[in-house]
């Protein structure tokens, strides 16, 4: 077993040897790509599903509330550990709203149906197309809406779907903070973060600053950084340009109430299985 920045041999191409100087898992690569090298640095990748990972440096912290302890990487002879939470349904929810419900023609178009303040007129969405991931780990539960009336609009339904993604993220960060893992901001990447309204909603729900890189391909950048470190090339000159989303303090109480209502709906749904 080698370090991420070890010597993995050579790839022979056109009679030339190309050295392989870096190997790292995809989510760990995104962690490195986002520059999460210190304890409490956290990234979240929003694609079909969502993968959150927070660096705990040389301390393998065990959390017995549905989150996983894993190795982040070994670089420069130093092993860093991480805590990971996996959310099963994110981008596939938006795809379902587009392809099955026919609410909009493109994922980009979904943004205009979002209420940036998170208001859904009491509609809640359980995002369990394939069960629930962290921290619930329930493969039997299935998705559903609650609170729909004859006055419910497409905006309410679409916003409730996006809220469910934010609330799953908040559930994980809340558990982390119970274990004294301080998270000042969240660095996010993946296809969904192109939706600026979602990023602001996520910031409001978590009551934390959300940072998105201008180049959202953090996994590829992370793998490149590992190879650069192995080749003794300075990574500090790489672009660190970020977009920032700060929470709207006037919505804090409303978002806490919405989150608590969503948690109650999820808990009751799990109990009925």
Give the location of each predicted region:
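Short beta-alpha connecting loops at secondary-structure transitions
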Residues: 74-83, 146, 206-212, 240-251
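Acidic, glycine/GT-rich loop-and beta-edge segments that sit at the periphery of enzyme/chaperone cores
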Residues: 102, 230-273
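Activation-segment/catalytic-loop signature of the eukaryotic protein kinase fold
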Residues: 117-219
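Hydrophobic alpha-helical scaffolding
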Residues: 18-22, 83-87, 99-100, 135, ...
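Beta-strand segments within the central parallel beta-sheet cores of soluble alpha/beta enzyme folds
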Residues: 1-4, 44-46, 109-113, 160, ...
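Glycine-rich phosphate-binding/hydrolytic loop that grips phosphoryl groups
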Residues: 30-33, 87-88, 163, 200-203, ...
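A conserved active-site cap/scaffold subdomain adjacent to cofactor or substrate pockets
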Residues: 76-102
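ATP-dependent carbohydrate kinase catalytic cores
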Residues: 1-78, 89, 105-112, 119, ...
């Amino acid at each position: 077993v080698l370090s991420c920045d070890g010597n993995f041999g050579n790839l022979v191409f056109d009679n030339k040897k190309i050295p392989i100087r870096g190997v790292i898992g995809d989510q760990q690569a995104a962690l490195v790509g986002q520059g999460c090298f210190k304890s409490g640095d956290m990234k979240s990748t929003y694609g079909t599903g969502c993968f959150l990972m927070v660096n705990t440096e040389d301390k393998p912290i065990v959390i017995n509330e549905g989150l996983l302890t894993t190795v982040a990487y070994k670089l420069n002879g130093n092993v860093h550990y991480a805590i990971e939470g996996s959310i099963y349904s994110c981008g596939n929810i938006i795809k379902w709203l587009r392809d099955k419900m026919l609410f909009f023609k493109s994922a980009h178009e979904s943004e205009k149906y979002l209420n940036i303040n998170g208001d859904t007129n009491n509609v809640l969405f359980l995002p369990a197309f394939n069960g629930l991931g962290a921290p619930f780990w329930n493969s039997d539960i299935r998705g559903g809406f609650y609170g729909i009336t004859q006055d419910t609009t497409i905006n309410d339904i679409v916003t409730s779907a996006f809220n469910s993604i934010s609330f799953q993220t908040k559930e994980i960060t809340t558990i982390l903070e119970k274990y004294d893992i301080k998270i000042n901001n969240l660095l996010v990447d993946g296809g969904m973060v192109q939706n600026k309204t979602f990023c602001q909603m996520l910031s409001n729900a978590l009551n934390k600053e959300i940072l998105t890189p201008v180049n959202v391909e953090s996994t590829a950048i992370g793998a490149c950084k590992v190879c650069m470190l192995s080749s003794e090339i300075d990574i500090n000159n790489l672009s660190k340009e970020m977009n920032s989303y700060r929470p709207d303090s006037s919505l804090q109480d409303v978002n806490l109430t919405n989150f608590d209502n969503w948690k109650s709906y999820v808990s009751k749904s799990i109990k009925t299985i």
